[in-house]
């Protein structure tokens, strides 16, 4: 099993546990250059809010989308968009990524801006 397959296996297990909770989830994905966050409804069929370093407003503010500062900005934006969509509490889906660095920065920023998980 290679590194990617192991991450996807962890993600599958996490998503199965989150599905039992019957609540919206904050799904995070990262690449070397960008970070993406989505609020997905409890059925898993609809995206309620999304933010990424590919958005035009975000690109203007950042020199690099692949660092902890960019992740913190995305965490702040996703929390604001979630509140606008009426979502206050979510389950955090780190997609099998280690809770460290950019993933942790995004989660901390989202919590500071009023998203509960």
Curated annotation (Swiss-Prot):
Disulfide bonds: none
UniProt entry tagged with the keyword Ribosomal protein: yes
Domain of life: Bacteria
Entries under InterPro entries matching the protein: Ribosomal_uL18_bac-type, Ribosomal_uL18_bac/euk
GO molecular function: 5S rRNA binding; structural constituent of ribosome
UniProt keyword annotation of rRNA-binding present: yes
Cellular component, GO annotation: cytosolic large ribosomal subunit
Matching Pfam families: Ribosomal_L18p
Coiled coil: none
Keywords noted in UniProt: Ribonucleoprotein, Ribosomal protein, RNA-binding, rRNA-binding
One Gene Ontology biological process: translation
Stated family: Belongs to the universal ribosomal protein uL18 family.
Function as written in the Swiss-Prot or TrEMBL entry: This is one of the proteins that bind and probably mediate the attachment of the 5S RNA into the large ribosomal subunit, where it forms part of the central protuberance.
NCBIfam families on file: L18_bact (TIGR00060)
PANTHER family per the UniProt record, alphabetical: 39S RIBOSOMAL PROTEIN L18, MITOCHONDRIAL (PTHR12899), LARGE RIBOSOMAL SUBUNIT PROTEIN UL18M (PTHR12899:SF3)
Quaternary structure and partners: Part of the 50S ribosomal subunit; part of the 5S rRNA/L5/L18/L25 subcomplex. Contacts the 5S and 23S rRNAs.
The protein's name: Large ribosomal subunit protein uL18
Record lineage: Bacteria, Pseudomonadati, Pseudomonadota, Betaproteobacteria, Neisseriales
